[in-house]
């Protein structure tokens, strides 16, 4: 894996965390009320990297977005600018909490249809994992039907990569079996797994013990390229000893959470930022380039992963 760490001075500084020793569980912070920063009228002019040469597929990914408010729209507008600047986007991918506060169908237009209208199309679908705010009130199946998606878990394929969507609201052995079956079958070199509650996190909710025991051993054994999670409203990228990259991308639009500087029990942290953002994923051959883009258009982090 080739890693490029990008630092910014002042308010956009990216904090690189120290290497942390693995242990059984990640220390968590008490539940806190999210804080919403002052929102500028419009994002600043984006400063995107040049599109990856030889790209055969790509997507944008985000989580914890579905408020229907200004910050969500600004993140979506910056995603549209990314798409219009020559970066390939074949799908929009979310790691859950797509419709606040309770996933009600009456909120689908405000939280899903309107914000992403400039990006979504028949050729550029929205593929979602369900978060707790989508599923806990019983509306998860309706959201999947609204987006013409199958029941979870499900798989999607783009050129060069397979995307596997799990329901982390019920991290059970049945899904572990499904995951093992999918990863054991012939397929692209790049396998990307998406679910809501994080395998590893250093913010309010912390790591998810049941996922760590049921799913992480499978992800590690098959050396998946990338795991995309949400639930904690910030950004962090971890890299395990098996060269699996775990990303928390909970900055899609809702209020942000502070990172716990005393966090333990995770793989080494490579980069973190308490910023609203999305991920731009570009695939070329057996490599993917992951670019983390702030709501205001700056590049917060970038890494290339090869399998």
PLM regions: where:
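A short C-terminal boundary segment appended to hydrolase-like catalytic domains
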Residues: 270-307
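Extended active-site neighborhood of metal-dependent phosphoesterases/phosphodiesterases
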Residues: 48, 87, 100-191, 203-226, ...
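N-terminal active-site segment of His-dependent metallophosphoesterases
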Residues: 36-107, 169, 174, 201-202
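Bacterial N-terminal signal peptides that target proteins for export
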Residues: 2-15
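Bacterial signal peptide processing site
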Residues: 27-29
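C-terminal motif of bacterial Sec signal peptides marking the signal peptidase cleavage site
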Residues: 22-25
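Active-site glycine-centered loops adjacent to acidic/histidine catalytic or metal-binding residues
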Residues: 64, 96-97, 131-132, 196, ...
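Residue-level marker for buried hydrophobic side chains located in beta-strands
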Residues: 59-61, 92-94, 128-129, 193, ...
